[in-house]
């Protein structure tokens, strides 16, 4: 529970955190980043495709001591060697293949691994072009102009026990 405690503590103190999102498919650029990897408070590793995260994690560990959190696009990206797992739920998805089936498939492995699990609601927002998340999930993004729907979706996630909410406008 250490990482979620650090995030909540920062929020309570009105302290900002910088998070770097690294896509395992683009890990060849990590070595070039070198000392820049010490700048973020934590690093998320994940992407919309099936790229495996372990090699990326190993490369990151060679360059930084920052906490590394899995931000998986699918269950194949799970590895218990990360510091925490962001257990993502795409809140504006409408199919069980996105909403719950992957969670059921990986639940026992996650629990047995002992990894810190942070429940995160993920909201896809229209970024003016079709994102890789939209293509992978067939989820319809919420229009940026519909702030009431975005807020209601975030509140619904909070009421369902999501510890964090992530807004995605495309990648």
Spans of model-derived segments:
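Conserved N-terminal beta1-alpha1 strand-loop-helix module at the mouth
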Residues: 1-63, 138-164
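Hydrophobic faces of well-ordered beta-strands that scaffold small-molecule active sites
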Residues: 16-22, 41-45, 68-70, 85-87, ...
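Short, ordered loop/turn segments at secondary-structure junctions
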Residues: 25, 47-50, 73-75, 90-91, ...
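Catalytic cores of alpha/beta
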Residues: 31-35, 70, 74-87
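Glycine-centered flexibility motif
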Residues: 46-47, 56, 97, 121, ...
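Alpha-helix-loop-beta-strand connector modules within alpha/beta enzyme cores
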Residues: 54-74, 106-118, 171
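Conserved anion-binding
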Residues: 77-154
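Short, structured loop/turn "capping" segments at alpha-beta junctions
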Residues: 130-135, 161-167
